[in-house]
C-alpha cells in the first residue's frame, strides 16, 4: 500500500486485522531492523492454525541500505515453499520503496555504475515481488469536506455544514493539507474545544 501521507494506509491494515481477528487472522509487525529475522519468524508461524499478516509500516530504503534484500528473499526467493497462511503487507509513501535518483534514470551521464539498467531492475524488483500494489491518493477538496462532515456528524458536533467547511478549510491549510488524517485531527480539535 503506497501513497500520500495521512490517506489511510496503516488504518486499512488495522481495519483488516480487526475485521478478520475472529476468523483467526493475526498481525505481526516487523520493523526494518528486524528484516534479518523474517525467515525465523515465518518458520515459527507457518504451521500454526492461524493466518498471519507480517506487516511493515512506513517501509522505505535509501539507495545505500541493503536490508531490503532479506525481504526480497523471503517474499519469492529461497528454496522453502511459500507458506499458505502468511501474507506480507507493507505501507510506504514511496511507490518503489527504494530511493531513486535522477542518476538512476539518466543513461546518458557517466557514473560509477557500468550497468545502470541492472541497478534500476534491482531497485524495482522488491516492489514487484509483492504482487498487488494499492495506491492511496489525497482526497479532492470536495471529498475532504465530505469526510469532515461525516466525522463531525458521527461525533455529534452541531456546527452547520457551511461553518464546518469554512473552519476545515482554514485548518487544512496549516495542518498538512488534504487527507483523512487532517480531517480527523480537525474533528479532534473541535471536540477538544467543547
Describe these PLM feature segments:
Residues 1-28, 41-47:
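Walker A/P-loop
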Residues 1, 16, 71, 91, ...:
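Conserved RecA-like P-loop NTPase ATPase core
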